[in-house]
Amino acid sequence: MVLLGDIHGDFQEIYYFSKRNETQEPINLIQVGDFGAGFRSSFIDDMEYLNTELAYNNVTLYAIRGNHDDPKFFNGDYNWSNIKLLPDYTVLEIEGKRILLVGGAISIDRLQRTENVS
């Protein structure tokens, strides 16, 4: 299990990490907020591509909303085989553990952010 946070839409880091899974043992990534959901108009396409790569490399990504994520992507409607965008207050049962994932607050600077920049 690997925890990461605050990637703010830099999905290439996850892609490169998954490519390094040479053993093909299952790896679970837990993104603990500020994933970057909804800031780029290409977000859905980015997830489709990333999901294909994660599946190929036997990596599953679980993401909880941060204050710099669009909450609408974490309502349970947006999930892929290897990417799970989890609702606030999810109890994730993984690798024999139960983890409470709370989710972030509403970002006070969301309207000032610029697509593909911040």
Positions of predicted regions on the chain:
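Core catalytic region of metal-dependent phosphoesterases/phosphodiesterases
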Residues: 4, 9-94
